């Protein structure tokens, strides 16, 4: 297998004045870059240490989401996954963390319609890239650069 190619995506949730940086297909090669991004949005101490251990472990099927509630910024990482099903698992898991961080910040009812719409909006923003990881052939091409 060749070098993995990480994909970056930035998007904004205007309704909440919230900026999101997503890293897809992450392996430990990108640890320093992502650590700098986490630090730049205020990640410190134990959270930064846990993130470093996660990113540098080189494990498949992992991810992380860190949000700065004051500045409304999030860094989300979806690591390289062993299958399309595992990608879907990580995608839903990390998206849910983002949803909960925003809901907590704005005191949204976790069982209410606004959170349900927020979840859908996040999914829509991520769909353009995420959909490519749900196709086995597409995943291999994206991650390893071959067909």
Regions found by a protein language model. Name each.
Residues 4-59:
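Non-catalytic terminal regions of proteins
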Residues 89-101:
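Active-site recognition of the HExxH zinc-binding catalytic motif
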Residues 101-107:
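Short helix/strand-bridging catalytic loops that position acidic/His residues to coordinate divalent metals
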Residues 109-141:
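Post-HExxH zinc-binding segment in Zn-dependent metallohydrolases
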Residues 41-85, 98:
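Active-site scaffold of zinc-dependent metalloenzymes
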């Amino acid at each position: 297998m060749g070098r993995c190619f990480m994909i970056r995506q930035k998007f904004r949730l205007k309704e909440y004045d919230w900026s999101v940086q997503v890293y897809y297909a992450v392996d430990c090669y990108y640890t320093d870059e992502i650590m700098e991004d986490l630090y730049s949005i205020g990640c410190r101490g134990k959270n930064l240490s846990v993130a470093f251990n996660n990113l540098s472990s080189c494990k498949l099927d992992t991810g992380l989401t860190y949000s700065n509630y004051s500045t409304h910024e999030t860094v989300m990482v979806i690591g390289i996954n062993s299958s399309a099903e595992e990608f879907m698992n990580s995608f839903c898991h990390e998206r849910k963390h983002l949803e909960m961080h925003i809901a907590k910040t704005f005191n949204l009812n976790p069982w209410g319609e606004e959170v349900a719409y927020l979840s859908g909006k996040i999914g829509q923003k991520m769909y353009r890239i995420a959909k490519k990881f749900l196709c086995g052939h597409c995943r291999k091409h994206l991650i390893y650069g071959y067909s």
